[in-house]
Amino acid sequence: LGLSSPMTKDRKILEKNYQKASEEIIKKLDEGKNVAYLTLGDPTVYSTYIYIQRIVKKCGYDAEIINGVPSFCAVAAKLGDSLADRSEQLHIIPSSYDIEEALELPGNKILMKAASKLSDVKKVLKEQGQEAWMIENCGMEEEKIYHGVEEMPEKATYYTTLLVKEAIDKNS
């Protein structure tokens, strides 16, 4: 069963898509089949899965979440560094929203799915004097790692994650 999701913020389009996907899953469940929904990363972090799961459960079906490796944890592992040390704060932010305000938060920041606003993100990082690492397609064949804002391209793919740390070890 292949399900796709539109890349939009339009709530009406998204809700319609979640409903359609849920109906397809329920149809398979009613046929006595087990259904698994695979997602990149973890299904509880900025994932389409949770919206579909809520509808399926509301219709009286059981659904179990099996955790995955969140993309930002995979990014930290790939970079060979921690997300937060000792008392550092960690913020996980969808970068398609108010990025300037988010980057002013204390501590380290993970910017999820940053491609759509990459030029804005780079501009704000430069203005605020912050440094960052960026990974496109972490763990995938097309993976690319960028050390610093200056290395980052103007355009990136959907699965782009940035790690902004208060103190980046430039030797990493």
PLM feature segments, named:
Residues 103-172:
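A contiguous loop/helix-start segment that scaffolds small-molecule binding in enzyme catalytic cores
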Residues 11-19, 78-81, 104-108, 146-152:
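Short, surface-exposed amphipathic charged segments that create phosphate/polyanion-binding patches used
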Residues 1-61, 150-152, 160, 165-170:
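Class I S-adenosyl-L-methionine
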Residues 37-39, 65-68, 134-135:
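General beta-strand structural signal in soluble alpha/beta enzymes
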Residues 44-105, 153, 170:
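Class I SAM-dependent methyltransferase SAM-binding "motif I" and its flanking Rossmann-like core
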Residues 20-24, 97-101, 120:
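Short acidic active-site motifs
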Residues 8-11, 74-76, 94, 120, ...:
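Short, charged, surface-exposed secondary-structure boundary motifs
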